[in-house]
């Protein structure tokens, strides 16, 4: 996609990467935003597996099996274990919540939402589940209901940096750039080491044409996480927008090398397209 931000011989690249955090950082999943060709990179995490105790119920045992499988990246096996847990105890909110994460992991967003609904019916004060349901709704293009969920997550936990970040993403998708900036800034106030929020605020500054502010935010994101390939790609995009093709190429090549090493073929190919566009 071409951002209409430049004049004369300056260059701008085709893709920026926006990060939405669910609950942790154990994996990455790509989904496309409805209103643009940007790429939403979602970091998917599961809770650390609990240790079995002599008092653990059968439902609890299957729940812990599910956590162990999910932590290993075996989402389908995790779903099977969570389902067994639920069949033994239909009031077990953590199993619905965790199965929702696993469904999201395999691309079943509707199934994820259904499970989050059940988890919230059983535990209506769980801020994390509201955040997770918001992410599932946002991935389906339902930004307004996603924002409603993020609002509730923030009401229940007013220092929930990830919920502010995710609400910022939804607002940015709706075109509310000022609202997005406010949310990203609040996320950073809560957690000054939050590289994801720096990256996303940088994207919003870049979209508005404030390339130097964008570069400053990308610098912070990369300082906090030197192997943060999306931020390297995005800083390269901003450098290209200022006419600094040399710095842009360096960042894009670093991003491509990291993504190639990680085996993230889709994002690697997009960065390579950015490099190709830069040479035009």
Spans of features found by a protein language model:
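Conserved alpha-helical positions within TPR/SEL1-like repeat arrays
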Residues: 60-71, 83, 94-105, 116-117, ...
